[in-house]
A protein has these predicted regions:
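Ligand-binding pockets and gating/stacking loops
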Residues: 1-290
Length: 290
């Protein structure tokens, strides 16, 4: 019996690079580093693409999700079910995702060859399969460098994580501190995002101009790296102060809140959607509860 080959590209003019082309460009690379091939970066920038990376630390088993092996010794207690792609099966725990399998890409061959979680997690997010003596940037930092902000009035890379927030400059690796991630603890906006009533906009601008002059003088006699990180965190905070409306939960309807759920991961992903729709280029969402 003949079957029609599945078309992995969605066919939309908005998606000029098909999944087949992207995977071909990735070639033998491991992790996300090869996504930064100039051809892909140029196409993504032209289309004004934005990215949400949802990282589940530890994660669910592939045998109970994307790659069930019912006849192997590793099989769990759950059945495999058919998807919208002939010949492709998911776990029975994912019935809704199985219905839209033709709209997503599932990569079953990615690995780091690193058995340690503590080193494997950053390795796959950086895309450096072997140690080269260089601190490689994480995906969000690399995209911030290559594509820049989707909206010049917003930071290009935000990170929503449990716990505390702050500016995480080490994510940028060799790109330099200015491409680090601004972390939002529990998805909350930075502390003191509202300017005190006692400080006018004119006074605030004058204070920041004085700060910038002091930083320039300080950099002339000391290393610039730490000062650059300090300046970048300040600039990002000022951008968010000017756009604090993007954190307004009143704009979210009850239907959205119900769809995403009241648990931390659901709330954080909904916040990521808010930020992406507002114009942030890249948002990473972390869950540490797996």
């Amino acid at each position: 019996m003949q079957t029609t080959p599945h078309n992995h590209a969605c066919g939309s003019a908005d998606h000029g690079i098909s999944r087949r082309q992207m995977l071909g460009t990735l070639g033998g690379g491991v992790g996300f580093g090869s996504l930064l091939h100039p051809a892909i970066a140029k196409e993504i920038k032209k289309q004004e693409k934005r990215v949400c990376l949802i990282w589940l630390d530890g994660g669910m088993s592939q045998y109970e999700s994307w790659h069930p092996l019912p006849d192997s010794k590793f099989a769990g207690p759950f059945r495999s079910i058919k998807t919208s792609i002939p010949g492709t099966h998911f776990s029975e725990l994912m019935p809704h995702t199985a219905k839209i399998a033709h709209k997503i890409s599932v990569i079953r061959t990615m690995e780091t060859m690193d058995p340690n979680h503590s080193t494997g997690v950053p390795r796959i997010q950086r895309g450096d399969p072997i140690d080269r003596g260089v601190d490689y940037p994480y995906l969000g930092s690399a995209i911030a460098k290559l594509l820049g902000p989707a909206d010049p009035g917003l930071p290009p890379y935000l990170w929503i994580k449990p716990g505390n927030g702050g500016f995480i400059h080490r994510e940028a690796g060799f790109l330099g501190t200015r491409y680090g991630a601004l972390a939002l603890g529990d998805g909350r906006p930075p502390v003191h995002i509202h300017r005190p009533d006692s400080i006018s906009a004119e006074l605030d601008a004058a204070r920041n101009a004085l700060r910038q002059k002091a930083n320039e003088r300080f950099k002339a006699y000391r290393g610039a790296s730490e000062i650059d990180a300090y300046e970048t965190s300040y600039d990002m905070a000022r951008q968010l102060m000017a756009r604090k409306d993007i954190f307004d939960d009143a704009q979210l309807g009850p239907k959205d809140k119900e769809r995403y759920g009241s648990h931390p991961l659901g709330r954080h992903i909904l916040r990521a959607r808010q930020l992406l729709e507002a114009g942030v280029r890249f948002v990473k969402v972390n869950s540490y509860h797996w």
